[in-house]
Amino acid sequence: MINAQDIKNGTCIRMDGKLYFCIEFLHVKPGKGNTFMRTKLKDVVSGYVLERRFNIGEKLEDVRVERRPYQYLYKEGEDYIFMNQETFDQHPIAHDLINGVDFLLEGAVVEVVSDASTETVLYADMPIKVQMKVTYTEPGLKGDTATNTLKPATVESGATVRVPLFISEGETIEIDTRDGSYVGRVKA
């Protein structure tokens, strides 16, 4: 149990039977009344963000989480098989627990967050930016750069990304895994 005043970004708490990560907090001391903590909490399972206010003396159940690097090996049915890079144990992780799964390639290293007491995987985070080779895209027309037009491109993981017209097949691009957006072209 922790006091509400001890909540910081990244703190994991159990509330109403659900796990939440604190993504934003503010210690508020109004001119009149009691001091409180205004927080934004993200549901680990659904990703839903809610705002919650806690009185300073309020006790909360904290959950100890572990973050470890895992390497993606292969897909088996609906599960993805990952290897713990410290113990070399292999663990299946469900598709819906992996953020940015469309950009997952064999050998990629992800950060797996698990409940330390139960060893239950809460979610797996891809790196924020990944570099991938464009495997297919329509050729851009020469001189067609007057507008900021985007075209679909398929990358080596099979995902489709909207890219500028000047990107061609075989080029390596950088992608933001949070929203699947094009970040830039990688210089060779």
Swiss-Prot record:
Enumerate the Pfam families for this protein: EFP, EFP_N, Elong-fact-P_C
The residue ranges crossing the membrane are none
CDD domains recorded for this chain?
S1_EF-P_repeat_1 (cd04470), S1_EF-P_repeat_2 (cd05794)
Q: Entry's Gene3D superfamilies?
A: 2.30.30.30, Nucleic acid-binding proteins
Q: Which domain of life is it from?
A: Bacteria
Q: What is its main location?
A: cytoplasm
The pathway it acts in is: Protein biosynthesis; polypeptide chain elongation
Signal peptide (from-to): none
One MF term in GO for this entry?
translation elongation factor activity
Localization recorded for this chain is: Cytoplasm
UniProt keywords (A-Z) are: Cytoplasm, Elongation factor, Protein biosynthesis
What role does it play?
A: Involved in peptide bond synthesis. Stimulates efficient translation and peptide-bond synthesis on native or reconstituted 70S ribosomes in vitro. Probably functions indirectly by altering the affinity of the ribosome for aminoacyl-tRNA, thus increasing their reactivity as acceptors for peptidyl transferase.
- The protein depicted here goes by the name Elongation factor P
Xref: SMART domains: EFP (SM01185), Elong-fact-P_C (SM00841)
Tell me its family: Belongs to the elongation factor P family.
